[in-house]
Every structure is written in structure tokens, then in C-alpha cells.
A protein has these predicted regions:
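Membrane-embedded architecture of ER/inner-membrane glycosylation machinery
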Residues: 163, 281-575
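Membrane-integral, polyisoprenol-dependent glycosyltransferases
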Residues: 1-371, 552, 561-568
């Protein structure tokens, strides 16, 4: 096996070990993941792979490709679970990492490709999306691969029709909507214009690719319309055009423009900290290159912009393409009112390349900044381990959590970390950050090169991610998951429908096997009902004339769906 193949398989193995083993460790603790998982569950139960109903009357918010993937994996595994719901996202991320690694290695060399891949793998936002059972990572992988394939198609003289790129765009649109096709066509179209391919030729190619890639989506739309009718059409319009235009019937992640900048800074932690810190170490000549030289300062703004634009268009084709991918997608998501950090994930691979180029230059210069960061993250690994042992020994009092609204929940987290039983394998994971810290301190003691410290910090981040996914997150979220509510309801009524009022309890419904129904939409004669406390008075006012309501239990913690305490009632029709 040659060196290139060995490096490829090492990266593949590292990605698998970091992302896959702990997918099933954490219970669902938010609305999003069980909402996706229950759609796949109802697909398998009903046999309806186009537009299955869940919660009795509800249809899925998005196209079905992710649900198909979850259902296929779950069928092979024997049922839908936390692991099978999250597995497609991890496979998509690993595939994207390996494809982008090969794409960069072929054009810029193996060292830069390895560093780019490590930066992506250690990005907080990428990691979070890769281990979550949500739509975002699957669509992002298709978008990034389609972009790379379209660049390769243009690079090779546009001799062959890029069917694989079109297939990726089609899968992207079937995952989360038209942006799976819009982004690759938009970026590639602008790139071809700047490369002087001609407007009509560029527009014609992109229109053709875009049209072919949305055909499967239109076919699914038609088949789903036959089942869902106007309700389906209204939902799809609201989730796509309504979300972009800010005309949705409910508030959906509405944020100002500066939110996108903050999420990028946070999503690239700690590499953004390293980048900012490095700016203070630049020599005067290097700092001038980042701003403007003396001759540029004497020119007018029009001349400066014209010269900057000329340099921008004449840079290396791959650099230009990556810059266009970052800038166009970022600007696109600054337009709608709805903004989320995961929307910007398609630009992360291309940003990783720019970070890798910058950090490699710093390392070649022998910057001591990497050694300082080794000390910082080594200390962080030691402090995390010491804090955990202090909690296990009962040295951290409950009073440290204060008396605020979330104090009881935080105390529950503390008790879970203190009292949960861990076997030998878990203790190895607990000690992993400490091992990483010792390796970093050894690098410092040996006066290792800046490049060694750079890779050491990346390795330390991976140790922290593994410890977090394998130990800390599963232990903590077990206290806030609504699986406990579902289990109490199962104990009260092992079979048949159960009911909720007002809010959607996606987690409870998932753990009940899609047994929840909206009591407002049905007329049961008796049963059990759950309601968040903030809607309890409204529920009593609406239902008390029809039903006799008897309280059964109330949670002592906040539901992860309702973000409030929940009360269960037994109800029966008044005589």
C-alpha cells in the first residue's frame, strides 16, 4: 500500500472512530432528532414512503431523503433508534471529509489536504451536525460534493456530462429543498462568468443542470400532493418560500445579519481564537499585506476597488472557486430573516482550506503561538479531568448551581455526573483528555516544531470530542430527556393512544412509538393527557365542560420539548 492510500485510510479510520461509536449513547433531548426519527418509524410501520402521517394527522416538514436513509438503516438494524437516526448524518460527514480530502490532495498536495480535513473534523459546528439526526449534514455533504464535481467538470474542459454532480444535487433537493441545487449552480455559474466562459453558455449549462436535479423533487411533490392535498402544498410553500421571505405563520429562528458572523466565529472555535491571536504576532510587512501597502493608500477608493477586483478575478482558479463558494452562500443566507448556524455549513470545507493555508504558513514561520495553544489545551484537559474527579468525590456542592430558574436542572446534571456507574471502557474515555494533555506537554518539553504543536492541538480537540460524546453528554442529557415521561405513560397505559394538548411532544411521541394524538383534533372518551404547565389553564378552560380531569403526576424537571414542567391528567367523558 503506497503512502497516499495509507493516509486516506488513516483519515477514514480516524473519522469513523470520532463520529460513529457513540451515536446511540445519548438519548434524544430536543425536538429535532425525534421529529426526524418518528417519520422514519411511521414509514416502516405504515409502508407509506411518500408522505407518512405521524402524531395521527401530521405530515413531515421536509422532503423524504433523510427519512428514507434512516428507515433503510433501521430496517437493517431491526428498528428505529437513536443510533440509526443519527447514522446517516455521520456517514454523510465522513463521505464529505474523504471526498474533499481527495479533491484538495489532487490539486494542492497531501499535507494541505490532511490539515484541511483535520480542521473540518475538529470544527465544533461540523462535529455537532455530524452526530445529530438532522437534515443539515446530509444536505451539506451533497452540496459540497456537487460543487467539487462541477469544478472538476469545468477543469477538464466540460467534455463529459456531470451526471454524478446532478445526482448529488437531486439528492440534496430531496433532503431539504431547492438550495441543494441552487448553491452548486449559483457558485459554478458565477465562477464560469469570472473565468470568461460567456454568459449564455454559463447560464445554459447551469439551467440544464438545475432543471434535471429538481425533477426528482417535482415527482415527489406530485406524489405527495396526491396524498396530502392543499395542506401539503401550504406546508411546503411556508417551509421554503415563506421561510426565505420571512412570511411564516410562526417565528422561525429570526436573527439579525450579525448573527451569521457570530455563528461562524463560534462554529470554528478554537481555530478562530488562534487566528485572532496570530494577527498580533504578524510582522509589519505581513500586516501590510493584510491591509494595504503605501502605494495603495494614496489611491482613491474607486481605484482601490478596481485593483482589488482585478486581483480577485485573476487569482488561482481553485482559490477563486472556494472564495465564491464562501461569499455567495454566506451572502445568500444574510437575506432571509430566518438564520441558523447550520445553514452556513456548506461553506465550512472551503473555509477549512483557507484556515489550513494560513496556519501552515504560520507553522513554517515557526510561530510560538502553537506552543502556547498546546499549553492552554493541555491545561484544559487536565482541569476537565480534575473537575470530573472532584464531582465524583462529592467536592462540588449543589449550592454552586445557584437558585435561578435552571438551578434544579443543573443540580440534576451534577448528580448524574456524580452518581452514574461507569465501567472500565468508560473510565478509559474519561482519562482520554488527560492522556492528550500529557502528549501536548511532552511536545512542549521536547521543543517540538510548530507543525507538531498544530497537529497536537487538533488531536487534543478530538480527544475532547470523544470524551464529550462518549461520557459527558450522554450522562447529562439523560436527566433532561423526555423518555422518562414516555415510560411513566407506558406504565399507566401499555397500549392504545395517549394524548397531548397544545404543544408537540416529539420526544415523548418517539419513545411511545407514535402513540400520541392531539386531543383537540379527536374526541376520545377516556385516556391520559399531558400538557405543559404554561398551557394548563387554557386546557382546563377548553376541555373541562366535556371531560372530568384528574391530575396523575407532574414532572419535577423541565421537559426538553416544552421547556417547562409537564402535568399528566386522566380524563373521561362527563355523564
Amino acid at each position: 500500500m503506497n503512502n497516499q492510500r495509507r493516509i486516506f485510510w488513516l483519515i477514514a479510520l480516524l473519522s469513523i472512530l470520532v463520529l460513529v461509536p457513540f451515536l446511540g449513547e445519548s438519548l434524544f433531548y430536543s425536538k429535532g432528532e425525534p421529529r426526524e426519527g418518528i417519520v422514519a418509524f411511521t414509514m416502516l410501520e405504515s409502508g407509506n414512503w411518500i408522505l407518512p402521517l405521524n402524531y395521527g394527522t401530521d405530515i413531515a416538514f421536509k422532503p423524504p431523503f433523510l427519512y428514507w436513509c434512516i428507515a433503510a438503516v433501521s430496517w437493517l438494524a431491526g428498528g428505529v433508534s437513536e443510533f440509526t437516526t443519527r447514522f446517516p448524518s455521520s456517514v454523510a460527514c465522513i463521505s464529505m471529509l474523504l471526498f474533499f480530502f481527495c479533491f484538495i490532495r489532487k490539486r494542492l498536495g497531501q499535507e494541505l489536504a490532511v490539515l484541511t480535513t483535520l480542521l473540518l473534523l475538529t470544527s465544533f459546528e461540523v462535529h455537532r451536525a455530524a452526530v445529530a439526526g438532522r437534515l443539515d449534514m446530509l444536505q451539506v455533504a451533497f452540496i459540497v460534493v456537487a460543487l467539487c464535481l462541477l469544478y472538476q467538470w469545468d477543469e477538464q474542459g466540460r467534455r463529459h456530462f456531470p451526471w454524478l454532480a446532478i445526482l448529488c444535487m437531486a439528492c440534496g433537493t430531496l433532503t431539504k429543498g431547492p438550495v441543494g441545487s441552487i448553491f452548486p449552480c449559483m457558485v459554478m455559474g458565477v465562477y464560469m462568468l469570472l473565468q470568461k466562459r460567456g454568459f449564455w453558455k454559463s447560464f445554459g449549462w447551469m439551467f440544464c443542470f438545475g432543471f434535471l436535479s429538481v425533477l426528482p423533487l417535482f415527482i415527489w411533490f406530485y406524489l405527495a400532493y396526491l396524498q396530502g392535498g392543499q395542506e401539503f402544498v401550504d406546508l411546503m410553500l411556508e417551509e421554503n418560500t415563506g421561510r426565505f421571505a420571512g412570511t411564516m405563520s410562526y417565528e422561525s429562528h429570526e436573527n439579525p445579519i450579525w448573527y451569521n458572523f457570530l455563528t461562524l466565529i463560534w462554529g470554528w472555535i478554537p481555530w478562530t481564537l488562534l487566528f485572532v491571536a496570530s494577527l498580533f504576532t504578524l510582522r509589519n510587512k505581513e500586516a501590510q499585506q493584510l491591509t494595504m501597502n503605501e502605494s495603495q493608500a494614496t489611491k482613491g477608493w474607486a481605484s482601490r476597488v478596481q485593483e482589488w477586483w482585478k486581483r480577485f478575478c485573476q487569482q488561482d482558479p481553485l482559490q477563486l472557486f472556494c472564495w465564491l463558494a464562501v461569499l455567495l452562500i454566506f451572502v445568500f443566507y444574510c437575506i432571509p430573516k430566518s438564520k441558523r448556524s447550520v445553514y452556513l455549513l456548506p461553506i465550512y470545507p472551503f473555509m477549512a482550506l483557507f484556515f489550513a493555508q494560513y496556519l501552515r504558513r504560520l507553522a513554517e514561520r515557526g510561530s510560538r503561538l502553537f506552543r502556547n495553544f498546546s499549553i492552554v489545551f493541555g491545561s484544559l484537559g487536565v482541569l476537565l479531568t480534575l473537575l470530573f474527579f472532584a464531582i465524583r468525590l462529592g467536592l462540588v456542592p449543589d449550592a454552586i448551581m445557584g437558585h435561578g430558574r435552571h438551578a434544579a436542572e443543573n443540580v440534576g446534571f451534577l448528580h448524574a455526573l456524580r452518581d452514574t456507574y461507569f465501567d472500565f471502557a468508560h473510565w478509559l474515555l474519561i482519562l482520554l483528555p488527560l492522556v492528550g494533555a500529557l502528549c501536548l506537554f511532552r511536545l512542549c518539553r521536547r521543543q517540538a516544531s510548530a507543525r507538531a504543536h498544530l497537529y497536537g492541538v487538533a488531536g487534543m480537540l478530538l480527544c475532547l470530542f470523544v470524551a464529550f460524546d462518549g461520557i459527558y453528554q450522554p450522562t447529562v442529557v439523560s436527566t433532561k430527556s423526555d423518555k422518562k415521561i414516555a415510560q411513566r405513560l407506558i406504565d399507566l397505559q401499555p397500549e392504545g393512544h395517549l394524548y397531548s394538548y397544545g404543544l408537540y411532544f416529539y420526544s415523548v411521541n418517539y419513545y411511545l412509538g407514535d402513540r400520541l394524538r392531539h386531543i383537540e383534533r379527536e374526541t376520545p372518551t377516556k385516556g391520559y393527557l399531558i400538557v405543559p404547565l404554561f398551557e394548563e389553564e387554557k386546557m382546563i378552560a377548553e376541555l373541562s365542560e366535556r371531560y372530568e380531569l384528574q391530575p396523575v403526576f407532574q414532572t419535577t424537571y423541565r421537559s426538553c420539548d416544552a421547556r417547562a414542567q409537564v402535568r399528566c391528567y386522566y380524563f373521561y367523558t362527563r355523564p
